[in-house]
From Swiss-Prot:
Oligomeric and partner information: NDH is composed of at least 16 different subunits, 5 of which are encoded in the nucleus.
Biological role: NDH shuttles electrons from NAD(P)H:plastoquinone, via FMN and iron-sulfur (Fe-S) centers, to quinones in the photosynthetic chain and possibly in a chloroplast respiratory chain. The immediate electron acceptor for the enzyme in this species is believed to be plastoquinone. Couples the redox reaction to proton translocation, and thus conserves the redox energy in a proton gradient.
Main location: plastid
Keyword Iron on entry: no
Enzyme Commission number: 7.1.1.-
Chemical reaction(s) catalysed: a plastoquinone + NADH + (n+1) H(+)(in) = a plastoquinol + NAD(+) + n H(+)(out); a plastoquinone + NADPH + (n+1) H(+)(in) = a plastoquinol + NADP(+) + n H(+)(out)
Keywords (A to Z) from UniProt: Chloroplast, Membrane, NAD, NADP, Plastid, Plastoquinone, Quinone, Thylakoid, Translocase, Transmembrane, Transmembrane helix, Transport
MF term (GO), any: quinone binding
The species this protein was found in: Platanus occidentalis
Disulfide partners: none
Source taxon at top rank: Eukaryota
Protein name per its UniProtKB record: NAD(P)H-quinone oxidoreductase subunit 2 A, chloroplastic
Coiled-coil annotated residue ranges, if any: none
Transmembrane segments: 24-44, 57-77, 99-119, 124-144, 149-169, 183-203, 227-247, 295-315, 323-343, 347-367, 395-415, 418-438, 484-504
Length: 510
């Protein structure tokens, strides 16, 4: 009898929760229509996986890619609409947030074809992989539009939990398990630090959680210049720093990059930085409006440390993925310059443009690592020697992406860095820009060192891995080459038409 009563209560409670969720989607669904498309795609993936056999695997890729493309289309149709606040102030939709959401969706769309061959060769579970990627994408999109402290905490946790599972996806690999453990422990610690910072912000503002209401609360309580705000700023900067992985919050990055499956690293290397950058700009600009000098100083220190340590340590690496890990630490230092400049002098427009180029440059490089690793089973930089003699397309596309990452003209990376540094120079960040220029020269050195290995034709330098190199007979090889071609084109051609891209970003933002 008691069991029946408890069961009936559970059914009633579940029905109420479902009806409330349905009511929210019915009245607020138009505000999060791109996110709803991904949710529908997730449900469809689960239904197909539970009712089908192995023959329907191509449908899983098709549904995932289609839901991402449809979500991008929905965002484009909603472009430049009036800003909207929904879900009782928890979520905000505007052009600034939608640009970052577009970048996250673009990353995920490119990562799925990049992963097809790797999944087939390693016999990874396909459905779960796609579910985690789409759910992480969903968490990143919600983080971009988060308008209160609770959503800013919950959305990245949704992203982070999927990231932990993806990084440890190859359970039999000891390095993958080690990377996941470090990632999980440091991620949990950073989340605790972030919540502690939020608690100081919540208390100082008189119990407000919405970003704009926090500013009003700080004015009413006269706490905007109090020590509590400084403490909140430090803790929140450390918490967000884990997601952005600037130095000295970068310790997890090389190990996770090296131990995780390569398609997962490609996905995490760009989406986490895009989502964290969107969140950082909103948090620093709105609640810490009165502490701009303090957070500018903090971010300048992080940018300098990231650019110097990231690029110098990258020179010493022998693993391609570890080298890209330290390179990404240096790259986030350049992005922080745009965050510091802000609205003035087109800082946000230049930051967004550079991140768009960084997505193509980075994913193109990882596509090459996936392709080469599947054929040779190695990640060592020395083992790439002479690749041009066996696979000219792979070697040339790798060289173009690496040169663009280094910032050599006339590639997209050069013009992206040029505009970013010029905005920083106009804003008076002379020392920061000078460090950026010097470290860019350092990065060109280790990128050119890899390109020299790729193009070498001397037999004594060619390793057995390249001598025995064979192109994959799998039909899915076309998918990774497609991703690589798109990334190479996006890393080269946009440099020629830089001004229109910047103009579109400026016009959209302001």
């Amino acid at each position: 009898m008691i069991w029946h009563v408890q069961n009936e209560n559970f059914i009633l409670d579940s029905t109420r929760i479902f009806m409330k969720a349905f009511h929210l989607l019915l009245f607020h669904g138009s505000f999060i229509f791109p996110e709803c498309i991904l949710i529908f795609g997730l449900i469809l993936l689960l239904m197909i996986d539970s009712t089908s056999d192995q023959k329907d695997i191509p449908w899983l890729y098709f549904i995932s890619s289609t839901s991402l493309v449809m979500s991008i289309t929905a965002l484009l149709f909603r472009w430049r609409e009036e800003p909207m606040i929904s879900f009782s102030g928890n979520f905000q939709t505007n052009n600034f947030n939608e640009i970052f959401q577009f970048l996250i969706l673009l990353c995920s769309t490119l990562c799925i074809p990049l992963s097809v061959e790797y999944i087939e060769c390693t016999e990874m579970a396909i459905t779960e992989f796609l579910l985690f990627v789409l759910t992480a994408t969903l968490g990143g999109m919600f983080l971009c539009g988060a308008n209160d402290l609770i959503t800013i905490f919950v959305a990245p946790e949704c992203f982070s939990l999927c990231s932990y599972l993806l990084s440890g996806y190859t359970k039999r690999d000891v390095r993958s398990n080690e990377a996941t453990t470090k990632y999980l422990l440091m991620g949990g610690a950073s989340s605790s630090i972030l919540v502690h910072g939020f608690s100081w912000l919540y208390g100082s503002s008189g119990g407000e959680i919405e970003l704009q209401e926090i500013v009003n609360g700080l004015i009413n309580t006269q706490m905007y210049n109090s020590p509590g705000i400084s403490i909140a700023l430090i803790f929140i900067t450390v918490g967000i720093g884990f997601k952005l992985s600037p130095a000295p919050s970068h310790q997890w990055t090389p190990d996770v990059y090296e131990g995780s499956p390569t398609p997962v690293v490609a996905f995490l290397s760009v989406t986490s930085k895009v989502a964290a950058s969107a969140s950082a700009t909103r948090i620093f600009d709105i609640p810490f409006y009165f502490s701009s000098n303090e957070w500018h100083l903090l971010l300048e220190i992080l940018a300098i440390l990231s650019m110097i340590l990231g690029n110098l340590i990258a020179i010493t690496q022998t693993s391609m993925k570890r080298m890209l890990a330290y390179s990404s630490i240096g790259q986030i230092g350049y992005v922080i310059i745009g965050i510091i400049v802000g609205d003035s002098n087109d800082g946000y427009a230049s930051m967004i443009t550079y991140m768009l180029f960084y997505i193509s440059m980075n994913l193109g490089t990882f596509a090459r690592i996936v392709s080469f690793g599947l054929r040779t089973g190695t990640d060592n930089i020395r083992d790439y020697a002479g690749l041009y003699t066996k696979d000219p397309f792979l070697a040339l596309s790798s060289a173009l992406c690496l040169l663009s990452l280094g910032g050599l003209p006339p590639l997209a990376g050069f013009f992206g860095k040029l505009h970013l540094f010029w905005c920083g120079w106009q804003a008076g960040l002379y020392f920061l820009v000078s460090i950026g220029l010097l470290t860019s020269v350092v990065s060109i050195y280790y990128y050119l060192k890899i390109i020299k290995l790729l193009m070498t034709g001397r037999n004594q330098e060619i390793t057995p891995h390249v001598r025995n190199y064979r192109r994959s007979p799998l039909r899915s090889n076309n998918s990774i080459e497609l991703s690589m071609i798109v990334c190479v084109i996006a890393s080269t051609i946009p440099g020629i038409s830089m001004n229109p891209i910047i103009a579109i970003a400026q016009d959209t933002l302001f």
